[in-house]
Amino acid sequence: MRLKNKIAVVTGSGSGLGKSIAMRFADEGATAIIVDVNERNMATAVAEIEARGGKAQGYRVDVTGQRALRDFMEELVGTRGRIDILVNNAGITRYRAFGAVGPEDWDAVLGLDLKAVFFCAQAASTHMVRQQYGKIVNISSSLGTGTTPHVGSLSAGAAAPYASAKAAVIQLTQILARELGPSGINVNCVAPGFFLTPLTGAARNPQEVEEHIRVRTEAAVLKRPGKLEELANAVLFLASDESSFITGETIRVDGGRTDRM
């Protein structure tokens, strides 16, 4: 097993991409620490992992709170002894017409999609530095490397807060890699393309969701959405010792997007 006896924290892992990552980790021998604000989703994820014979524990944590994160990491280390892996997956998106995007949209999206990534890494790395070992994987997006297609009433500018945050995560990954590398900590990033998740139609007009799916699918060379296990496999590689000489890198898991700019 590639992650035998590892303690792996995955934020936003009660559903969607995060849940698939946590389940993959547990399949490979890790104890998956399910971090989510939705207690029902969190409990369901833990139960599903345990039903497959894996190990998991759930924590309800608001990852936008620096003090809450520090307390959570301290409690986890006190219970489990260490933190080996952190996957910064928690995120939100808000799509509004370009002219309707307001300060509250920027604050909400950057608060979770960027600031929380930094503070999670900061809190976890305190313990990883003591261990002289750790793996941090940040989840960015293909929108961090290119623009979103214009669909219906929503132009590229509708995703400005989300895309900007995800682009910043790629740069933050390099900064953290340089900062933490001397302490034996690898920091890498995965930029997913189009996957069908609960965020697919988030904040979109229901009539535009089908067109959104078509346009995003056509933008990929493989002409299909990604499968959750395909993303989880990429994250698993970066979380395992198979990637021990890789740090500061971003792997695009996007089916070959042709609309990058």
Task: Please annotate each region the language model reported.
Residues 181, 186, 246-248:
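Short, small/polar-rich loop/turn modules that mediate ligand/substrate recognition or access, typified
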Residues 39-40, 59-71, 103, 229-230:
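The beta1-alpha1 cofactor-binding region of Rossmann-like NAD(H)/NADP(H)-dependent oxidoreductases
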Residues 7, 14-16:
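Conserved glycine-rich cofactor-binding loop
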Residues 220-231, 242:
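A conserved structural motif in NAD(P)-dependent oxidoreductases
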Residues 121, 165, 173:
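Active-site helix of classical SDR
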Residues 97-98, 105-110, 150, 158, ...:
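Substrate-binding pocket helix/loop in short-chain dehydrogenase/reductase
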Residues 146, 197, 236, 247-261:
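Short C-terminal tail/terminal secondary-structure segment
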